[in-house]
From Swiss-Prot:
This is Zinc finger CCHC domain-containing protein 9. Its main location: nucleus. It comes from Mus musculus (Mouse). May down-regulate transcription mediated by NF-kappa-B and the serum response element. The gene is Zcchc9. Residues 22-33 have a biased composition (Basic and acidic residues).
Amino acid sequence: MTRWARVTTSNSKRPLSATSWEDMKKGSVERADQSLPNRKQCQSSRLPLRNDSPQAKRKKNKKKKEYLNEDVNGFMEYLKQNSQVLHNGQLIAADSQEVREEIAVALKKDSRREGRRLKRQAAKKNAMVCFHCRQPGHGIADCPAVLESQDMGTGICYRCGSTEHEMSKCRANVDPALGEFPFAKCFVCGEMGHLSRSCPDNTKGVYADGGSCKLCGSVEHFKKDCRENQNSDRIITVGRWAKGMSADYEDVLDVPKLQKPKTKVPKVVNF
């Protein structure tokens, strides 16, 4: 390796002896030793992002033990030993007359509540009339005559016969020759292919006590299921009370009539 000294006044270049590899290695080691304390100081001044110490690695997140006893500080046990309970924020004896009366009243209320619930269930069941045998006390799903009959099925779709969905959710295409509901048996005439509401022998339709749809007069559906009601543009809205509104204010429910757009006539300019 040849090194050249700085240029002097003259343009002559004097070659110098090359530096040996041993001297270069010694110089690099000395510079590294001098920079070590500075690095240690910088590292000590910085906060570590994570604790890599062996003690920290040994520690594991222990699962918190569940309380076996809710009485942590032993206060309830102390009250039991002294035969005392809390009553409306006051300490009274557990065997006092007030506590006994409250317990008796609470038990009496629970028994009355349960009795009323059983009465409601019994009244609802007695008012139910089976569509198949016309006997009160049970529905068609619990009718013993339906279980004996092979033609009548329960829990199936009357349109396609599937047990995975209801009749209202069926999307199957049915042959009109088989009827609207091929798997349904009429309760009135006993034939397959239609429901009792569409039976020609049933003059009352779905209105067992008489009546008809108030919109179209049909007896095969209720007012809520009427097609005219679904296709109508009438919307029932409920107004809101605003601050400062008059008590005599009434909402106008009439739908405004749509105005037809005027056709533009070409303008003629005469010169």
